[in-house]
């Protein structure tokens, strides 16, 4: 046992400026990039610092260069968790007050992302032995999950505001109704890991043809 118990000090609570983590999710064409840059501009007016845009979408963020002032960071594959962390850290070190990431979904299912890394780990551990691959499936998640945890922990140490864009897909589920199988809509599901979404200060969904106006209706979210 510890012979010297830890001591803790309580002070009056004072509101401080806490960095924002904002998640914008939606299908293609829902206005994620424009909305993210508009949000970033509003945040910058309060907190200062430069706006940095990390672009994994083949330079598409540059379409809005005439509308918003920001520094563009081209981010190509691989899209590993630690690659994202390095990009975020470099932006903050360079003076970013707000960082827009479009798209964060590549960290989950893009080349070099979490799902891709788990598949590579399966190849390393079991090769083409399909029975063994099934046995070590959970073990193969250890490295991808550790890398994502490192991303999250590192992100939370950065003194800047972040706006993350997530792709979303419309999901369905087969359901038995009166002995027949019917396809029931389940809403939009963001392409991202739950543990990353949980860290956001706020998440909102941009529906198609919404003009960038978010919806908070739970039935629209898978």
Please give the residue ranges for each predicted region.
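Glycine-rich, phosphate-binding/catalytic loops in enzymes
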Residues: 70, 115-120, 180-181
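Conserved nucleotide-binding/hydrolysis micro-motifs of P-loop NTPases
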Residues: 57-61, 104-107, 114, 168-173, ...
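A conditional alpha-helix N-cap/helix-loop micro-motif detector
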Residues: 80-81, 141-145
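Short amphipathic alpha-helical segments
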Residues: 65-66, 112-113, 175-177
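Conserved P-loop
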Residues: 2-7, 12-94, 98, 105-106, ...
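Phosphate-binding/switch region of NTP-binding enzymes
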Residues: 27, 146-222
């Amino acid at each position: 046992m510890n012979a010297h118990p830890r001591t803790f000090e309580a002070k009056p609570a004072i509101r401080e400026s806490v960095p924002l983590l904002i998640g914008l999710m939606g299908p293609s064409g829902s206005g994620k990039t424009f909305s993210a840059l508009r949000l970033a501009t509003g945040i910058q007016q309060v907190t200062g610092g430069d706006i940095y845009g990390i672009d994994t979408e083949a330079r598409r963020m540059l379409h809005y260069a005439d509308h918003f002032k920001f520094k563009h960071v081209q981010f190509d594959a691989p899209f590993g968790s630690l690659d994202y962390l390095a990009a975020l850290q470099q932006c903050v070190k360079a003076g970013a007050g707000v960082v827009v990431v479009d798209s964060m979904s590549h960290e989950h299912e893009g080349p070099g992302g979490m799902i891709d890394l788990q598949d590579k780990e399966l190849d390393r551990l079991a090769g083409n032995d399909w029975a063994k691959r099934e046995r070590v499936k959970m073990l193969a998640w250890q490295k991808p999950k550790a890398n994502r945890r490192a991303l999250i922990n590192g992100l939370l140490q950065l003194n800047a505001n972040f706006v993350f864009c997530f792709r979303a897909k419309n999901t369905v589920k087969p359901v038995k109704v009166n002995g027949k199988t019917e396809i029931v809509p389940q809403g939009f599901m963001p392409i991202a890991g739950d543990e990353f979404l949980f860290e956001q200060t706020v998440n909102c969904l941009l529906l198609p043809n919404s003009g960038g106006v978010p919806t908070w209706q739970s039935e629209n979210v898978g």
